[in-house]
């Protein structure tokens, strides 16, 4: 694979461009330069979560890095050889552990031995996939594609306190293609209201609204109290296990937002996905594109194309010899198809 310098404009997207570019630079060996990082955001440049991802990526592949500073709007990253090992990274805030781990996994799956990665920060952050999504929805699909990863949620961490912790065990693997046309029949459903230092009636009201909107039984709805020291925090998670996929939807309690409104948000997400008949919801689609591209082929259906998916597609096609196509479905939605370029 060529080792030409890849130059990207980071102004058109947020941290997604940075994370995908780091993953691809590590796995392909191609040096990277990003300008205007998060240029259109209210707080442009690298935040703590992004900086942790950069420094972690650099440690794993012995990269030469310029611009790895808080607030930096330009980054140069020249990767070396990927090294298996026992790693620990602390974000130092409630920044997302999930997003940092997703940045590192493709490289560690290409390493020369087994690795352990411990990441501390936010495990349940409204601006990122919760750890439950990684464990229950995303990683099982990667495992079907050949990835060998085990993930433990050691401690929950909510915004703004953080303090959560994930532990991943990663073994070298070879990617293989995956096709996801539809979810298949629903097999199991579960709603969980997580409460850490939050009154129990908040979760009870959330679960009652889930019953009203979705008709889920008492056995399918669960109140889960976490240690107060892990809070304050509240998340409502819906999990739908189907024949071919497990879908996870999440909404977070926030000041000024009623418990009923939180439940409405997550129920609306789930209903929209179920009615679409597509395999991957919008957020899962964002996260599937890169591993499928690394496999060199694959396809999935999704109800709509997010801005994240569109910008991610452009970054991937700069690094890898793949073509990512979009086919409109007759009943609505899209089929994303990855083929060799």
Swiss-Prot record:
Matching SUPFAM superfamilies: EPT/RTPC-like, RNA 3'-terminal phosphate cyclase, RPTC, insert domain
Pfam families: RTC, RTC_insert
Binding site for ATP: 102, 283-287
Record function comment: Catalyzes the conversion of 3'-phosphate to a 2',3'-cyclic phosphodiester at the end of RNA. The mechanism of action of the enzyme occurs in 3 steps: (A) adenylation of the enzyme by ATP; (B) transfer of adenylate to an RNA-N3'P to produce RNA-N3'PP5'A; (C) and attack of the adjacent 2'-hydroxyl on the 3'-phosphorus in the diester linkage to produce the cyclic end product. The biological role of this enzyme is unknown but it is likely to function in some aspects of cellular RNA processing.
Gene Ontology MF annotations: ATP binding; RNA-3'-phosphate cyclase activity
Catalysis: reaction(s): a 3'-end 3'-phospho-ribonucleotide-RNA + ATP = a 3'-end 2',3'-cyclophospho-ribonucleotide-RNA + AMP + diphosphate
GO annotation, cellular component aspect: cytoplasm
ATP-binding keyword on record: yes
Main subcellular location: cytoplasm
Annotated active site: 308 (tele-amp-histidine intermediate)
Enzyme Commission number, as recorded: 6.5.1.4
Keyword Ligase included in the entry's annotation: yes
Keywords: ATP-binding, Cytoplasm, Ligase, Nucleotide-binding
Subcellular location: Cytoplasm
Listed name of the protein: RNA 3'-terminal phosphate cyclase
Any coiled-coil regions, as ranges: none
InterPro entries: RNA3'-term_phos_cycl_insert (IPR013791), RNA3'_phos_cyclase_dom (IPR023797), RNA3'_phos_cyclase_dom_sf (IPR037136), RNA3'_term_phos_cyc (IPR000228), RNA3'_term_phos_cyc_type_1 (IPR017770), RNA3'_term_phos_cycl-like_CS (IPR020719), RNA3'P_cycl/enolpyr_Trfase_a/b (IPR013792), RPTC_insert (IPR036553)
Family: Belongs to the RNA 3'-terminal cyclase family. Type 1 subfamily.
Record-level GO BP terms: RNA processing
Residues that span the membrane, as ranges: none
